[in-house]
UniProtKB/Swiss-Prot annotation:
Forms homodimers. Interacts with ubiquitin-protein ligase UBE3A/E6-AP; this interaction stimulates UBE3A ubiquitin activity. Interacts with host TP53 and EP300; this interaction inhibits TP53 activity. It comes from Human papillomavirus 43. A zinc finger (unnamed) spans 31-67, 104-140. This protein may be involved in the oncogenic potential of this virus (cervical neoplasia-associated virus). Plays a major role in the induction and maintenance of cellular transformation. E6 associates with host UBE3A/E6-AP ubiquitin-protein ligase and modulates its activity. Sequesters tumor suppressor TP53 in the host cytoplasm and modulates its activity by interacting with host EP300 that results in the reduction of TP53 acetylation and activation. In turn, apoptosis induced by DNA damage is inhibited. E6 also protects host keratinocytes from apoptosis by mediating the degradation of host BAK1. May also inhibit host immune response. One of its GO terms (biological process) is symbiont-mediated suppression of host innate immune response. This is Protein E6. The keyword Transcription applies. The keyword tRNA processing does not apply. Keywords: Activator, DNA-binding, Early protein, Host cytoplasm, Host nucleus, Host-virus interaction, Inhibition of host innate immune response by virus, Metal-binding, Modulation of host cell apoptosis by virus, Transcription, Transcription regulation, Viral immunoevasion, Zinc, Zinc-finger.
Length: 155
């Protein structure tokens, strides 16, 4: 698909499908990092995570699951600023954590209010990575806690 068949205004997978008049399961889109075609499950996952489409030379790109996790981990190592509890995050941003868009640092899904409450109740810290606040969604939280119990490295 190129800019000739649909405009480059689409920012999400859903907008891309609407503008190009195709259905989500039939969308074929490449990974911006590894250049492989995303599987249908990866396209759905990308859409569910509310991630943005990237345009290069008139073509839209997304990111496959493996590249999302890999580049997320690289970003943690290279751009970790510091960790802080919810009250510090709110003090610094002058907003409640519920008003902030905080994504999971592993899968990049926006955290729901329940997931933000989980951080507060469990006294877990949020992480400032590349000047953006991140935390863990419930799915990634569970896998990280299991790893910690087995004395493995942190997620």
């Amino acid at each position: 698909m190129s800019a000739r068949s649909c405009s480059q205004n689409a920012r999400t997978i859903f907008e891309l499908c609407d503008e190009c008049n195709i259905t989500l399961p039939t969308l074929q889109i490449g990974c911006i990092f590894c250049k492989k075609w995303l599987l249908t499950t990866e396209v759905l996952s990308f859409a569910f995570r509310d991630l943005r489409v990237v345009w290069r030379d008139g073509y839209p790109f997304a990111a496959c699951l493996a590249c999302l996790q890999f580049h997320g981990k690289i970003s943690q190592y290279r751009h970790f600023d510091y960790a802080a509890y919810a009250d510090t995050v709110e003090e610094e941003t002058k907003q409640t954590v519920f008003d902030l868009c905080i994504r999971c640092c592993k899968c990049h899904k926006p955290l729901s209010p329940v997931e933000k409450v989980q951080h507060i109740v469990q006294k877990a810290q949020f992480f400032k990575i590349h000047s953006v606040w991140k935390g863990y969604c419930l799915h990634c939280w569970k896998s990280c806690m299991e790893k910690r119990r087995r004395s493995e490295t942190m997620c």
